From Swiss-Prot:
It is an enzyme of class 2 (transferase). Belongs to the RNA polymerase beta' chain family. Keywords: DNA-directed RNA polymerase, Magnesium, Metal-binding, Nucleotidyltransferase, Transcription, Transferase, Zinc. Mg(2+) binds at D462, D464, D466. It comes from Chelativorans sp. (strain BNC1). Pfam families: RNA_pol_Rpb1_1, RNA_pol_Rpb1_2, RNA_pol_Rpb1_3, RNA_pol_Rpb1_4, RNA_pol_Rpb1_5. The lineage of its organism: Bacteria, Pseudomonadati, Pseudomonadota, Alphaproteobacteria, Hyphomicrobiales. It comes from the Bacteria. This is DNA-directed RNA polymerase subunit beta'. One of its GO terms (molecular function) is zinc ion binding.
């Protein structure tokens, strides 16, 4: 009621509805139309009376009254004079709120260039005038004149003249024969006199005729700016301002502090500066002061305006009284503290509180304990309303009093209010959506919030002093969403991987594990029990223990729900757990009839969730939590010093290794091995020793021991903790009871003296010092990691935020091919894991029987996966977000299963944000360091190939010869070994590298694990293909080849050295040739000579004059093995991939199929030409630095996509050469590899969604009949639309190819300028948008949050749809009514306006 009365006297304009926001340059007329008056004086307020000065920065006549409905002099007060303008002080009588919206202006005495369009690179003014920024600044800051009208003189248009040159020109040509200007007036004149249409035409014709790349780029840049101005209707001269707007005074307040001082916004200082200089300049012009003084004043005015708009962009930063830089208008928007990120994207909210959390094990999963005091404060409005409704109070004031006194009826009402009203709990940092969940509050005494133990994993919370925030959803809709979508019981699965996240941890795991142990020779072993009653009785009377081996009957149901019972060999403990399992034929007793480690418990919960649904799972989880806690307590498993068993053999192993290290030291001193080799060998030896000590320790700790009566002793408690997955790991146990082993220095290299002691024995001072070295680095790393990981998440969210599920099915026939990922013979990710929850693109057919396992278009679920794996299928084609053809967002079928729900994804799900969170959230678990591989302590490259299935061998592109030793050697560069099953279907295919020895041939049968081929991982062989005699060319001792003797073995080897470093060797071309029986260079079968060009570091394997047969090695090139390279791992690697950076020494990839030819060498590069098999294509040539290990020979056949030079491929190259699918699989596999190393599960589809966002732009290659310019980057959606239109009109469509953008670049290039500006480089984004007159259609999530609307995802998307339907229905009804009454609206324009949202 009160509100309505207020509204009568205080009418608020209804909020305008709008569909889009446009940004453009403001013309002087526009600025004047906004303004309520000119500000002429720099004064702010009178310091005695605190009244604003007239015509000053806070003038009440211009901006409005200070008090509501009261003029400044006090002549008119009260509501009745509303709208009167006081004749004494000139103030309009109205609300003081208008001081937040009324603007003023300052008329400048001289024009001033807007710094954003001048200095924000690329400079718009510079591009338009085709001048360099330096030259423009010279004119602007009064150093040089610029010729604006050359007339008939020899001067050129836009030529710069210094003061002397200008004087000379005036003397020479006379003053009126030409015009030269200086300062912003000159720039304004030039911009105003530009004929944009003509310039655009000229540029286009010039573009068509030019051939140079650089020139083309420059013209393109200029044409783009010109077109922007033409399309947006902005005028270039508006970039130079004659009038500047002044923002409303309440947005730059001046607040009196006590003690007569004032706190003021920096903007007031900046405006004051501008007004002072402007007034001085006006006075100087009136006084007709000398030119030099006026010029100086104009320059100072330009600098003052620059500082107001963007302080520090040019010249010195202007500082305030306390030497602090003043905050200009640009700074208000920029960065984390700017308007966008501080106030628009992150707001503080009412009805929230925070407190410390404690554990609440007796809560149900959907509950949380809320302190009474907190609840009373949070739910105040609800309590007031209820007190009023029940008649305890008649006014809000009374209700307030009652609540303050905490009367008993208030507590009763609080109980009512809180019932079924969920609250949101949030723990910072909120890294993924499970960081905010809804719970039903239970009132508790005390001041700490109680949290259910099972949700701790999702919040990443522990109880060592963590705090959490509580928020109250107020509206009914918000409560509904909280209950249906955010309730903790609805978030059982992890959105990143689909694995359960409500899983017992720590104590609960320990209790369940203890309960499920089976010991030998326990009392009551071999007894049989009919039901739980008997068993309980036996346990209570201690006839059996929890761990006795018994037989028990387990009751469950069959498919039709009829009760059945089965007898299992089990333990009483497992029977107790089995009692809690929901009765379902798909949930057998076997899943808990085993040692329950954390993994097995997780599997158990997953099975229950899949087959029994959510409600059963929640009940089950709560029950096993209680069971776990109670048995962990009863078991009393503790951590004792004597549980850490130090192996007896430790001393012996260490002594052996010390002897070895001494021996290596001796060999080094004798000069047999190098320093590096010694280091590697010593480190290796200690690493092995450490491993063996650890193995011995584990053996001792694991050992099962029996007491005198033959009963099995209690298991080692540390082992139980570690093995169950409750706490601790073998690595930590090794440090406690084995030896600490090798330590790393901060740079990642390994210190060669290990720490021999363990923590139980204690470290010596030296050892302690060594161990602090690497440990401190670890701490520093952790701090950096958090920031880096957060920044990665922010970039990911920004690039993916507008990816939403918009339609049920796009009907595309494109997709990806999924295969299992195999690494060094191990299957890292099975085909089942990769296709689970995806939609099949084609029918998945069992190769043996021909039956269809999954029909095309169906979701592949757990059952299908079992069938697929059983049938041994190796490739499945699936739909993917990457290939989805929806214009904005993705479709539900391409996305597949919503991992957090286990059902097909809903329309409106913000899959982009979920993907970004899933990838970013584990970021803090990844490492930061670059690995330096030392010795074989880490990985040895794979050097052999084993059959992973049994079957028949088939060799594709067979090219093998038998060498002198009788081995089959691979001579082809793209030979593959396939293994076929009985039905002839391909089970596996392996590429075999050139020079490998191969042990099988076409048609051979192989068993699983049989060796197929092997090769030397550290060298690349050069093989001869013809028989003959070896001859050397240009191999001169000491210049191009040198002999080195390996002293430990006494073997000499000859290697090629850098011959170009000596003047004598500069034109040598070292090579090995094979001569035939006539002494001529032998010819190869495919043409060309048998000549091998050698690169630096190649080791010769044959002597001159030796006889060779095909397949023999003539030389070896040592490769950089994995152990000498620095491997970028962890977070930096993920960031590098998402940013699509080119790696340091990236691979060179062949663009076409063809034959390799060597061209003329070029300085220190080798020229390689690929001659295509397809005669319509042009040959492609590559330049490769000499001395890089390089393994192709003249005449080799090469396939598109093969590596010419090894290294990490650049993602852009993969996209250009092999296409989108290959790029996707490369990025997905590389990123997954980093996460897999840390044991983090992330579903492929999340990475695919991000890659989709990186591939949204098309580079125009041919313009056709479109207005595009070749080289333009255009949005895929827009490109398709333009082409569709052109095709309809029968014109030639534009051509383009997809471009890969890194995530930062992609975020900055989103169609929405609001979203881009709030991400990074705010000034640049806004400058660009203003020049182009961009329109933001508010499609993404971020823009809508910023303008304060519901986001177009989830329920917000549904609401928008409902509104659209409602609007169209209203229109229909109105039309009907109009027709019935037969009255047409008089003016059709009015009818249009009625339904039109304002711009």
């Amino acid at each position: 009621m009160n509100q309505e009365v207020m509204n009568l006297f205080n009418p608020q304009a209804p909020a305008q509805t709008f569909d889009s926001i446009r940004i453009s340059l403001a013309s002087p007329e526009k600025i004047l139309s906004w303004s309520y008056g000119e500000i002429k004086k720099p004064e702010t307020i009178n310091y005695r009376t605190f009244k604003p000065e007239r015509d000053g920065l806070f003038c009440a006549r211009i901006f409005g009254p200070i008090k509501d409905y009261e003029c400044l002099c006090g002549k008119y007060k009260r509501m009745k004079y509303k709208g009167v303008i006081c004749e004494k002080c000139g103030v309009e009588v109205t609300l003081s709120r208008v001081r937040r919206e009324r603007m003023g202006h300052i008329e400048l005495a001289a024009p001033v260039a807007h710094i954003w369009f001048l200095k924000s690179l690329p400079s718009r003014i510079g591009t338009l005038l085709d001048m360099t920024l330096k030259d423009i600044e010279r004119v602007l800051y009064f150093e040089n004149y610029i010729v604006t009208e050359p007339g008939l003189t020899a001067l050129k248009q836009n030529q710069l003249l210094s003061e002397e040159e200008y004087m000379m020109a005036v003397d020479e040509y006379g003053e009126d024969s030409f015009t030269a200007m200086i300062g912003a007036e000159a720039i304004h004149h030039l911009l105003a006199s530009m004929e944009l249409e003509k310039i655009a035409g000229d540029l286009r014709s010039e573009l068509a005729s030019t051939t140079s790349d650089l020139k083309q780029k420059k013209l393109l840049k200029r044409l783009k700016v010109v077109e922007n101005f033409l399309e947006s209707g902005n005028k270039p001269e508006w970039m130079v301002m004659k009038i500047i707007p002044v923002i409303p005074p309440d947005l730059r307040p001046l607040v009196p502090l006590d003690g007569g001082r004032f706190a003021t916004s920096d903007l007031n200082d900046l405006y004051r500066r501008v007004i002072n200089r402007n007034n001085r300049l006006k006075r100087l012009i009136e006084l007709k002061a000398p030119g030099i003084i006026i010029r100086n004043e104009k320059r100072m005015l330009q600098e003052a305006v620059d500082a107001l708009f963007d302080n520090g962009r040019r010249g010195r930063v202007i500082t305030g009284a306390n030497k602090r830089p003043l905050k200009s208008l640009s700074d208000m928007l920029k960065g984390k503290q700017g308007r966008f990120r501080q106030n628009l994207l992150g707001k503080r909210v009412d009805y929230s509180g925070r407190s410390v959390i404690v554990t609440g094990p007796e809560l149900k999963l959907h509950q949380c304990g809320l302190p009474k005091k907190m609840a009373l404060e949070l739910f105040k409005p609800f309590i007031y309303a209820r007190l009023d409704a029940k008649g305890y109070s008649s006014t809000v004031k009374q209700a307030k009093k009652l609540v303050e006194k905490e009367k008993p009826e208030v507590w009763d009402i609080l109980d009512e209010v809180i019932r079924e009203h969920p609250v949101l709990l949030n723990r910072a940092p909120t890294l993924h959506r499970l960081g905010i969940q809804a719970f039903e509050p239970i009132l508790i005494e005390g001041k700490a919030i109680q949290l259910h133990p099972l949700v701790c994993t999702a919040f990443n919370a522990d109880f060592d002093g963590d705090q959490m925030a509580v928020h109250v959803p107020l509206s009914l809709e918000a409560q509904l969403e909280a209950r249906v979508l955010m309730m903790s019981t609805n978030n059982i699965l992890h959105p990143a991987s689909g694995a359960p996240i409500i899983v017992p941890s720590q104590d609960m795991v320990l209790g369940l594990y203890y309960l499920s142990i089976m010991n030998q020779n326990e009392p009551g072993e071999g007894m049989v029990f009919a039901d739980m009653g008997e068993l309980q009785h036996a346990l209570e009377t201690k006839v059996v223990t929890l761990h006795s081996k018994i037989k028990g009957r387990y009751k469950t149901v069959d498919e039709n729900g009829n009760p059945v019972s089965m007898i299992y060999e089990t333990t009483p403990g497992r029977m107790i757990i089995g009692e809690l399992l929901p009765k379902n034929h798909n949930v057998p007793f076997d899943i808990c009839n085993q040692e329950l480690t954390k993994k097995n418990i997780s599997k158990m919960i997953d099975t229950v969730y899949r087959h029994c649904g959510q409600k059963e799972t929640v009940i089950f989880c709560d029950r096993i939590m209680a069971l776990g806690f109670s048995h962990a307590c009863k078991a009393g498993i503790s951590f004792g010093k004597d549980d850490m068993v130090i192996p007896e053999t430790k001393a012996k192993l260490i002594a052996e290794t010390e002897a070895l290290a001494k021996e290596y030291e001796q060999q080094y001193n004798d000069g047999l091995i190098t320093q590096g080799e010694k280091y590697n060998k010593v480190v290796d030896a200690w690493a092995k020793c450490s491993e063996r000590v650890a193995d011995e320790m584990m053996k001792r700790i694991k050992a099962i021991e029996f007491d005198d009566s033959g009963r099995q002793k209690q298991m080692n408690s540390i082992y139980m903790m570690s093995h169950s997955g409750a706490r601790g790991s073998p690595a930590q146990m090794r440090q406690l009871a084995g030896m600490r082993g090798l330590m790393a220095r901060p740079d990642g290299s390994i210190i060669e003296t290990p720490i021999i002691s363990n923590f139980k024995e204690g470290l010596t001072v030296m050892e302690y010092f060594n161990s602090t070295h690497g440990a401190r680095k670890g701490l520093a790393d952790t701090a950096l990691k958090t920031a880096n990981s957060g920044y990665l998440t922010r970039r990911l969210v920004d690039v993916a935020q507008d990816c939403i599920v918009v339609t049920p099915d796009c009907g595309t026939d494109k997709g990806l091919t999924m295969q299992p990922i195999v690494d060094a013979g191990q299957v890292v990710a099975s085909i089942g894991q990769r296709v689970l929850g995806r939609t099949a693109l084609d029918d998945v057919v069992n190769p043996a029987t021909g039956e269809v396992i999954v029909q095309a278009g169906r979701l592949i679920d757990e059952r299908d996966v079992e069938a697929i794996e059983a049938a041994g299928i190796q490739t499945v084609r699936i739909r993917s977000a990457l290939t989805c053809e929806v214009r904005t967002g993705v479709c539900a079928v391409c996305y597949g299963r919503d991992l957090a729900r286990g059902t097909p994804v809903n329309i409106g799900e913000a899959v982009g944000v979920i993907a970004a969170q899933s990838i970013g959230e584990p970021g803090t678990q990844l490492t930061m360091r670059t690995f330096h591989m030392g010795g074989t302590a880490q990985v040895v490259d794979q050097s052999f190939l084993e059959a992973s299935f049994e079957g028949t061998v088939k060799i594709r592109n067979r090219n093998v010869v038998r060498n002198s030793d009788g081995h089959l050697v691979v001579m082809g560069r793209n030979m593959a070994v396939l293994i076929l099953d009985e039905a002839g279907a391909e089970r596996a295919s392996h590429k075999v590298t050139y020079g490998s020895r191969i042990f099988v041939d076409d048609g051979d049968k192989v068993k699983r694990g049989q060796r197929i081929a092997e090769w030397d991982p550290y060298t690349r062989p050069m093989l001869t293909e013809v028989e003959g005699t070896v001859a050397f060319e240009d191999l001169v001792d000491g210049i191009s080849v040198q002999e080195t003797t390996d002293e430990s073995t006494g073997i000499t080897k000859r290697e090629v050295i850098d011959w170009r470093s000596t003047p004598r060797g500069s034109d040598l071309k070292p090579a090995i040739t094979i001569l035939d029986s006539k002494g001529k260079v032998a010819k190869l079968a495919r043409g060309g000579d048998a000549r091998f060009l050698l690169s630096v570091e190649t080791v010769l394997s044959v002597d001159s004059g030796a006889k060779v047969r095909p397949g023999d090695v003539v030389a070896r090139i040592p490769t950089e093995s994995a152990r000498t390279k620095d491997i970028t791992g962890g977070l930096p690697r993920v960031a590098e991939l998402f940013e699509a950076r080119r790696p340091k020494d990236h691979a060179i990839i062949a663009e076409i199929d063809g034959t390799v030819r060597f061209g003329r060498d070029y300085k220190n590069k080798r020229r390689i030409i690929i001659e295509p098999h397809d005669s319509t294509l042009e040959p492609v040539e590559y330049l490769i630095p000499k001395g890089k290990p390089f393994h192709l020979q003249d005449g080799d056949v090469i396939e598109k996509g093969d590596f010419i030079l090894d290294g990490n491929p650049a993602p852009h190259d993969i996209l250009a050469i092999k296409g989108v699918e290959a790029l996707a699989s490369y990025l997905v596999n590389e990123i997954q590899e980093v996460y897999r190393l840390q044991g983090v599960l992330i579903n492929d589809k999340h990475i695919e969604v991000i890659v989709r966002q990186m591939l949204q732009k098309v580079e125009i290659t041919a313009q056709g009949d479109s207005t595009y310019i070749p080289g333009d980057h255009v949005d895929q959606v827009e490109f398709d639309e333009v082409n569709d239109r052109l095709v309809e009109e029968g014109k030639k469509p534009a051509e383009g190819q997809p471009v890969l953008l890194g995530i930062t670049k992609a975020s900055l290039q989103t169609p929405s300028f609001i979203s881009a500006a709030s991400f990074q480089e705010t000034t640049r984004v806004l400058t660009e948008a203003a020049v182009a007159g961009k329109i933001d259609t508010l499609q993404g999530l971020k823009e809508n949050v910023i303008v304060g609307r519901l986001i177009p995802a989830g329920t917000g998307g549904a609401m928008a749809q409902i509104r659209r339907i409602a609007r169209s229905r209203d229109d229909l009804i109105l039309d009907e009514r109009r027709k019935e009454s037969g009255v047409e609206m008089a003016n059709p324009a009015i009818a249009d306006m009625a339904g039109q949202p304002a711009e």
